[in-house]
């Protein structure tokens, strides 16, 4: 069964249901079912390999008990069963005594804010049966199909309104991971992990390079990948994604990674590698903005993440992240953050990405920054990745591909003795000494695109782009008004 056939069949069934409204709800609905199916498969393995293992999920709510039978409970009785199941799984005892391996905690936290949107128990049974028909984890092809279906759903997020913020195109995550060059045993962290794209790209990188070949290697991998995600929907997606990639109990917390002050991080919490695409265009409240020192304080989410990332890296730690153009040319507090970055880290490479990499979610220009903590920057290499031949812009139907990174792959070179060998300046690449950057008031908007072209999008993509940008502006206005109202209330106005 082809991935596209399964995905289409599931969408066709759910489209009939009155409770499903749009791709984001379709994806959430499918994902909680895939999570329960995947977790039940894990529990069956644990039961087979550990005689003392006792299932986390109560017997009547295990997928293999209530969902596997194609002629099983359906209609209103099925809806009632799912409601009772959610209630029970959200109230599992997650104390250390009862849950030493944090498996109950995982189920509880994943399902805490998840919804069953479907109104028809009959249609829900059809969806469940289709999932069971096409995905069998005991077959290799079944696992591959699961990953294919899941990755396809995550890709759909990019055009699913505001939910697009949680998805980073996989060619981007794979490129960043390849050039961070993680080693098995290094601690790897994504503080804004969304659907888990960077973390699963790390796992795939290790597998592609035959780095995980023994039980001990597998255990090391399990214990070195970590993440944080603030919102429940992408958290569900991330956990299920990591389960599908072989992580038994993903070490991903639901929290705001910016909530603690940067001075509070302990040596034990610091990591070797951070790969991330922090939210940009958003604003944090005043309390969160105070989690960094005064001279670096503002409400721009991406700026705050960068300050936290610098604090979380060990000396010698490496980072690859996505940041918008606004950070590169920004002044004031942004200049202060860039000054700190250049003084405390070796910002060795900035890749200027084409404008529509994240289309249709956003048309904001983005960049990939690579740096190492613990030594100051001597100079920065810039590379402008041009739109590939035959493309005016990327879109849902013509997305960015891994092959589009070939020009920068060929240029990248090799770091030897603290210097890059094989790199050369050209009409798309430039080396800028740090003294010139300082003299330019820390402006990093260099080696940019010389000509702006007007994008003429198809009507459906133009409307989606307009609605997304309108929603983003409205959210920022609401955030600012909320801060003003809070300030007025504090002063008794």
Segments (PLM) and residue ranges:
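Helical mechanochemical/support elements of P-loop NTPase systems and associated helical scaffolds
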Residues: 6, 22-26, 123, 145, ...
């Amino acid at each position: 069964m082809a991935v596209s056939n399964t995905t289409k069949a599931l969408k066709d069934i759910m489209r009939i249901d009155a409770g499903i409204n749009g791709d984001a709800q379709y994806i959430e609905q499918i994902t909680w079912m895939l999570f329960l199916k995947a977790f039940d498969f894990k529990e069956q393995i644990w039961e087979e390999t550990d005689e003392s293992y006792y299932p986390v999920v109560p017997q009547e709510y295990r997928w293999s008990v209530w969902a596997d039978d194609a002629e099983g409970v359906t209609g209103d009785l099925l809806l009632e069963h799912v409601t009772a199941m959610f209630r029970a799984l959200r109230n599992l005892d997650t104390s250390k005594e009862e849950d030493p391996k944090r498996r109950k905690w995982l189920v509880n936290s994943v399902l805490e804010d998840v919804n069953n949107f479907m109104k028809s128990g009959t249609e829900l049974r059809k969806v469940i049966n289709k999932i069971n028909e096409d995905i069998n984890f005991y077959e290799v092809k079944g696992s591959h199909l699961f990953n294919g279906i899941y990755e396809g759903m995550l890709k759909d997020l990019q055009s699913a309104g505001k939910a697009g913020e949680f998805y980073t195109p996989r060619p981007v995550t794979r490129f960043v991971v390849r050039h961070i060059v993680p080693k098995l045993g290094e601690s790897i962290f994504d503080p804004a992990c969304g659907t888990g794209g960077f973390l699963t790209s790390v796992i795939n990188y290790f597998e592609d390079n035959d780095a995980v070949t023994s039980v001990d290697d597998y255990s090391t991998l399990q214990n070195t990948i970590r993440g944080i995600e603030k919102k429940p929907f992408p958290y569900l997606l991330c956990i299920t994604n990591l389960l599908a990639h072989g992580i038994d109990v993903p070490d991903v917390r639901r929290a705001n990674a910016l909530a603690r002050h940067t001075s509070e991080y302990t040596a034990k919490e610091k990591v070797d590698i951070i790969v991330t695409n922090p939210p940009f265009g958003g604003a944090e409240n005043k309390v969160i903005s105070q989690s960094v020192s005064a001279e670096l304080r503002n409400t721009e989410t991406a700026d705050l993440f960068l300050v936290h990332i610098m604090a979380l890296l060990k000396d010698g730690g490496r980072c690859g992240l996505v940041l918008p153009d606004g950070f590169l040319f920004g002044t004031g507090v942004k200049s202060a953050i860039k000054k700190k970055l250049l003084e405390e880290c070796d910002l060795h490479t900035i890749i200027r990405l084409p404008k529509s990499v994240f289309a249709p979610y956003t048309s904001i220009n983005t960049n990939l920054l690579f740096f190492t903590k613990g030594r100051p920057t001597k100079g920065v290499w810039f590379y402008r990745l041009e739109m590939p031949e035959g493309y005016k812009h990327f879109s849902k139907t013509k997305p960015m591909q891994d092959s589009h990174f070939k020009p920068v792959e060929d240029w990248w070179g090799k770091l030897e003795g603290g210097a890059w060998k094989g790199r050369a300046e050209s009409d798309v690449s430039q080396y800028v000494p740090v003294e010139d950057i300082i003299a330019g008031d820390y402006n990093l908007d260099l080696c940019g695109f010389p000509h702006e072209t007007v994008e003429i999008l198809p009507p459906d993509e133009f409307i989606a782009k307009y609605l997304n940008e309108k929603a983003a502006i409205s959210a920022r206005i609401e955030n600012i008004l909320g801060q003003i109202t809070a300030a007025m209330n504090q002063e008794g106005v």
